[in-house]
Amino acid sequence: MITKQQVLEFLKNYDLENITIATVCSHSSLQIFDGARKEGFRTLGICVGKPPKFYEAFPKAKPDEYLIVDSYSDIMNKVEELRKKNVIIIPHGSFVAYLGTENFAELTVPTFGNRAVLEWESDRDKEREWLLGAGIHMPGKIDDPRDINGPVMVKYDGAKGGKGFFVAKTYEEFDELVDRTQKYTIQEFITGTRYYLHYFYSPIRNEGYTLSEGSLELLSMDRRVESNADEIFRLGSPRELIEAGIRPTYVVTGNVPLVARESLLPLIFSLGERVVEESLGLFGGMIGAFCLETVFTDSLEIKVFEISARIVAGTNLYISGSPYADLIQEDLSTGRRIAQEIKEAVRTNQLDKIIS
């Protein structure tokens, strides 16, 4: 992985009065570009082949310029061009997935956030070590599929938008559905309501909900719309569907907004705080936007089944603010909050604390 010192050497040649915010044209890029523009930054969209036509329909979020590449791996050959434009990369889930975690770790362009989190986020065993070390309640993990004796969720490593995930109740069902060519994790299936909690950790702000270093914000929350799981039971009971050879799938197709009971906010903040504090000790901290993927049970317990250590697509619901972000600042999206962090770091000469 590129070292922090190498990144700081690149920054010495940057014109910090003319930073360009860049990301791949996908996932949450409209929100990122809109937020960057609101904070006065130039924007650059990276795309394969030609610029997406639909960007013309959203002039406020259309980037100021595009970098056209032959393939996403070709980004690695454009690093000097990006650095000449004083680019800071904003990674989102698709950026990392398309470029590949190894390439992303070696990308010689200053990047918002701490790339060291990749080692802990992309490996489900290390992710579990991190969350359990933070005192987070997680679904039980089953190491041997022959021990399955009730509903479990089987997930593959990496950001796949839920593709290929499945529920099994027996070893036989698991054996029928699993793709053994991929690394997988088997988790106890928790009944309850799914909440995806969108946080922002700043190592350079020391006001609001403060931690041992910096501060934590809760910007929004959502629930994912999954195909075909969210509509399939219109066709019949689970038993009838299985008899018909139809099984639920969990591909994310969109998001719906949520708020939580106000009495749950102390626990929600506590979860975010514990995860950040643990990250500070493990790898120097998880910087910027992150999401805890949770289930709220009927006993009002919150179980965390995964973490996404960057901006998530569910924040796209709130380009003009959310019920929580509006109580911090009107018209505050996660994309805009990222731009504010960069702007503040430049102003206070603290870019080294938020860039890797």
Curated annotation (Swiss-Prot):
Keywords: ATP-binding, Ligase, Magnesium, Manganese, Metal-binding, Nucleotide-binding, Purine biosynthesis. Residues 101-333 form the ATP-grasp domain. Binds 1 Mg(2+) or Mn(2+) ion per subunit. GO terms for molecular function: ATP binding; ligase activity, forming carbon-nitrogen bonds; magnesium ion binding. The keyword Manganese applies. Pathway: Purine metabolism; IMP biosynthesis via de novo pathway; 5-formamido-1-(5-phospho-D-ribosyl)imidazole-4-carboxamide from 5-amino-1-(5-phospho-D-ribosyl)imidazole-4-carboxamide (formate route): step 1/1. It catalyses: 5-amino-1-(5-phospho-beta-D-ribosyl)imidazole-4-carboxamide + formate + ATP = 5-formamido-1-(5-phospho-D-ribosyl)imidazole-4-carboxamide + ADP + phosphate. InterPro entries: ATP-grasp (IPR011761), ATP_grasp_subdomain_1 (IPR013815), IMP_biosynth_PurP (IPR023656), IMP_biosynth_PurP_C (IPR009720), IMP_biosynth_PurP_N (IPR010672), PreATP-grasp_dom_sf (IPR016185). Its EC number is 6.3.4.23. Mg(2+) binds at residues 293, 306. It is an enzyme of class 6 (ligase). Its cofactor is Mg(2+); Mn(2+). Pfam families: DUF1246, DUF1297. Signal peptide: none annotated. PROSITE patterns: ATP_GRASP. It comes from the Archaea. ATP binds at residues 145-196, 226. Belongs to the phosphohexose mutase family. Catalyzes the ATP- and formate-dependent formylation of 5-aminoimidazole-4-carboxamide-1-beta-d-ribofuranosyl 5'-monophosphate (AICAR) to 5-formaminoimidazole-4-carboxamide-1-beta-d-ribofuranosyl 5'-monophosphate (FAICAR) in the absence of folates. This is 5-formaminoimidazole-4-carboxamide-1-(beta)-D-ribofuranosyl 5'-monophosphate synthetase. It comes from Methanosarcina acetivorans (strain ATCC 35395 / DSM 2834 / JCM 12185 / C2A). The gene is purP.
